Amino acid sequence: MIRRRPLLALPFALPFASVALPGCGDQGKASEDAAFDAVDLAKEIVARDVEQVRKGMPEGVKVLQKRMPSDPLGSRLELQTAIKAARENTDSLQIAKSTFFSFATPDGLVLRSEIDPDRLVDQNILKAFPGLAKALEPNAGLVEAYGQLEALRGVRKGDDLAWVVAHAVPAKEGDKPAGLFLSGWSFRLYARVMQEGVRQKLIERTKTSEKKEIPVVYPYFLKSGGAYGDPDAPDVNAEQLVKLEAGSKAQSADFRTHIEIEKRTFGIAAKKEPLFGDDSAIAVVASVF
């Protein structure tokens, strides 16, 4: 699980401003290739981490149902302990990169989350994500939604988007659900996991390769016209991805180009990512020095 922590600058984050150019020679091609390759690495990481959540939530519900207090509204500390047990006793959720695990009543009121401070408590998740109400229907299984809620933001400023996964928790008695088990992540906070994962894979490659240079890489989620990267990534990266319409262009074919930024060349690549719907893609802004 991703723990909230101070948003410290990464050693390879460089501030810059962008201007799109038609071509920048060999360095442009090399940076494009690096970005294109890094997209595949990012997609591998995302596929692994999404599977952990989707596989783990139904199993976690079984643990949560057993540990739930009879009066969750009046026993919120006990409920928090049950939520923690659901994650810790489910193999996939133990290592999931979620930024929250929470429980909500059938009408959407979040009673407790696993970690403190609990920014989501007493928020109505169904008002922010009405589509999650489908999870309360018989045999609905997992239901997912995307949107914005201040309590789920992973950054103090700038755009963010949340991925929320819900699964009904059966009541110990009766047919109606006791509530919803919730998880998911802030795309901005998860982008940090994706970025660090891609960089680590590139470092590992240098151990068995003659090429020891590691490109600068900034992975992004692209969805619904927005671009969501590591909180410390330069804002201009996301602005450029939106300006280039990289997300929409990647839906029909893999997208790649390069731009010059303060006399340095950066490659951009994007590929669609159906794990998050038809309007989603993974992009990387990269530079080979």
Per-range role (PLM):
Residues 80-95, 173, 180-229:
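Solvent-exposed, extracytoplasmic
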Residues 4-8:
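N-terminal export leaders
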Residues 113-183, 258-262:
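Extracytoplasmic/periplasmic ligand-binding sensor regions of membrane-associated signaling proteins
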Residues 24-77, 95, 160-165, 177, ...:
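Juxtamembrane extracytoplasmic/periplasmic/luminal helical "stalk" adjacent to the first N-terminal
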Residues 89-140, 154-155, 224-243:
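Extracellular/periplasmic ligand-sensing ectodomains of membrane signal-transduction proteins
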Residues 11-19:
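Bacterial N-terminal signal peptides
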Residues 80, 158-202, 269-271, 278-289:
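Conserved beta-strands of PAS-like sensory domains
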Residues 234-289:
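Extracellular/periplasmic juxtamembrane segments that couple receptor/chemosensory ectodomains to their
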